[in-house]
Amino acid sequence: MKKILLMLLLCTPLLYMGCKAEPEWVNLIAQQEQEKGQEEEQEEADSEFKWANLADSCTTVLINQFMNKPKGTFWATPANESNNSGNIYWQQAHAMDVVIYSYQRIKDKNPSLADTYENYFKLWYDNKANNYDKGDTKYGTTGFGNRFTDDMCWICLTLIRLSEATGDDTYINMAKTVYDTQIITRAWEDEKGKGLPWKELSVDKTRNACTNAPGCLVAAKLYLKFQDAKYLTDAKTLCAYVNANILKSDYRVGEPPLTYTQGTFGEACRQLYHITQEQSYMAIAEQVISYAFTSTRCTNKGFLRDEGTDMNQSIFKAVLIPYVVNLVLDDAASGTVRNTLTLKLQDNAEALRKNMDRTLWPAMYCNYYWGSSFNSANIASMGAQASGASLMEGVARLEAAQAK
């Protein structure tokens, strides 16, 4: 094509002597060559693109902009700009989960960064994950006890993940203590079954999805580690309570359906399937997790919706994503479900990638809704950043699995 263009350009002065303007077809060929070059450059760039690189960027922003590094805990806004981070406890679990997945991904190729991450883990643990109730002995002496039962469940799940990632049982042993002394001791039973209350019994006995789903998962994980039958009994009991009283016929986990409870209950059922080999658990796991991506109650224009901007709502998707990836990577799950969820994750990741403004680095923030860009005139949210970074770490896990 370039040789043809050169010959045509050489002939042009002879054919069009005295004309100041280039013939239209010459300009058209030049334009086509330019567009072709741009397309080739874009194809080359796309072929070199790695989700792991974008995961690095998003997680780095989460750490550098939102972590109180001397304590290993997270602020609600960059450098605590809004001065409103004192009461965020359960959210600390899901921000740290992002760092844990990053740690697992990079530890072999970047030991120095892995050491830095391990130090953050210890600081987070030593500072009791920013627990505002840590000094109240009414909730035990571990420093992780809290008036909210669900908050303790979320924190215990991250303590368990820390042990799974590092091999240090300090964390899961603490989770066991908190569960044994402060979580399961609050469970109460009536004609509806036995379940966990949202808060301490003297304050609020409500048994909801956001407490019983993670409580069930904690019990299942403790059983896998310690092989104590009481944990399996607890997991089955709490799962049965959710099935009987909270799960809807269309697989909404409560009303309104929220991504974090859809994901957590799905993961609890998936774990129970692998413990018991009872197919009914896997069937529920597939349905409730799929609901988060296929129902318009949880999506907006095909992407996971903006569930709210406060610190309780903005971090919901950070809870969901790892459990979706776990299901996709589970060979025991339906191939159709796994393929569908893979495409949904990729679509959401591509949307977030498209809508992140890299020119704003290091303030390259994720929006609450991945189908649009973050407004840099607003104050960024740790919850939104953790959710976006969780998505990127998740698709990076899929990318690594596919490369094997």
Regions from the PLM with identified roles:
Residues 1-4, 20:
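Positively charged n-region of N-terminal signal peptides that target proteins for export
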Residues 44-98, 102-150, 207, 280, ...:
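CBM-like carbohydrate-recognition segments
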Residues 114-222, 232-233:
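Extended ligand-binding groove/face enriched in aromatic
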Residues 261-276, 281-297:
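Oxyanion-binding "anion nests"
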